Regions:
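Membrane-helix interface segments
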Residues: 43-45, 72-79, 112-113, 150-151, ...
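A short amphipathic helical element positioned immediately N-terminal to and/or at the very start
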Residues: 33-38, 106, 209-221
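Transmembrane helical segments that form the transport core of multi-pass membrane transport proteins
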Residues: 214-271
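Hydrophobic/aromatic residues in alpha-helical transmembrane segments
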Residues: 21, 31, 60-68, 82, ...
Length: 337
């Protein structure tokens, strides 16, 4: 009962925060009337380009999972990724919630617990490390223009540091059984401490368990990591393509916002979206992206229009495809090992 109340409270707080952003903060940056005018000026060639890019963003979500689990059909991989992402959009929890939901759907697709856990962990690590490193890449691209603010540089540095920590820990796990045991034991202690804070049972995890998983899956990872890396990059950068096209579609020229600045704004938005602040990061992601671009001197109404257009193209197709997929998953039962 307490858990359900806490979940409801988190949802209410997240929705309240998003409402404040859209009702109070965004209108102070640009009126919705002026934003609507910019959106109304999107020509049909730009609309077609945006539709194609949005479709690519949806379709490429299956690539990382197919790289690790080739026994998954394309339709199965696409369906479960969209279903799990749709749930994370409407429920607060960020990346950790998405990983837990993905595991459950893989079990319903008759993937063994070991394979499902391994795939969820690796896709989560690969995705999160890249997301955390993108702001650093963007900051380096912007640095040469002299438009990089101290606050933006700080965000990029902190994000890159977090990504480096995750990458080092992952490398340690792969390097030797002893390192894997140490990382597993440390993760178990941190997990137990966190679960005590929220009054839940500690995770059933240990260093020995990680050593066993490493021994079972290391050869598979050595074969698959190049395709996993390429497919993860391909999927994530299609979302950036949607954002870049959104900027140009509403009339923001490359001179006003060069790709280096748009990439940094997009990268900051991706980092924020992985945090369990609001369902799907709605409100806070938009605010982070708008604030970054406005800080670069871009026209306010155009920026707000582009960001809202981008977010709609990322969220709405996933919700539609995801909830259709959910109807199918309800008929499946998890596999018994």
């Amino acid at each position: 009962m307490r858990r359900s109340r806490r979940a409801v409270l988190r949802s209410v707080l997240g929705i309240g925060l998003a409402a404040i952003v859209f009702a109070e903060i965004v209108p102070r940056i640009a009126s919705y009337g002026s934003v609507a005018k910019q959106l109304a000026n999107v020509s049909w060639p730009w609309a077609v380009a945006l539709a194609v890019a949005a479709a690519l963003d949806v379709l490429t979500t299956a690539l990382p999972w197919r790289a690790l689990l080739p026994q998954l059909s394309w339709l199965g991989a696409l369906g479960f990724t969209q279903a799990s992402t749709a749930l994370t959009i409407v429920l607060p929890g960020g990346a950790p919630l998405g990983m837990a939901i993905s595991f459950g759907f893989l079990r319903r697709l008759r993937i063994s617990a070991g394979e499902a856990g391994f795939a969820v962990a690796l896709t989560g690590i690969w995705s999160q490390v890249m997301i955390l490193l993108y702001p650093l890449v963007g900051a380096l691209l912007v640095f040469g223009s002299g438009n990089l603010s101290t606050s933006t540089a700080t965000i990029a540095g902190a994000s890159a540091a977090a990504g480096a920590v995750i990458a080092v820990l992952a490398f340690a796990v792969l390097r030797s059984p002893g390192s894997a045991r140490w990382v597993g034991d440390m993760a178990a202690r941190v997990g137990a401490w966190f679960m005590r804070l929220i009054r839940r049972d500690p995770p059933a995890w240990s260093g020995e368990a990680l050593v066993q998983v490493r021994a079972e899956r290391l050869a598979h990872l050595r074969r698959r990591w190049p395709s996993l890396t390429a497919s993860t990059l391909g999927n994530q950068l299609t979302a950036y393509l949607v954002f870049e096209l959104s900027l140009r579609a509403v009339g923001i020229s490359i001179e006003a916002v060069p790709p280096s600045e748009s990439f940094l704004a997009w990268a900051i938005g991706r980092v924020i979206s992985s945090l369990p602040l609001t369902p799907g990061g709605i409100g806070v992601v938009e605010l982070g992206m708008i604030g970054t671009l406005v800080g670069f001197g871009a026209p306010h109404a155009h920026v707000v229009a582009a960001v809202l257009l981008y977010r709609a193209l990322i969220i709405v197709p996933t919700l539609l495809v995801g909830f259709v997929a959910l109807l199918g998953f309800r008929r499946l039962e998890p596999q018994d090992d």
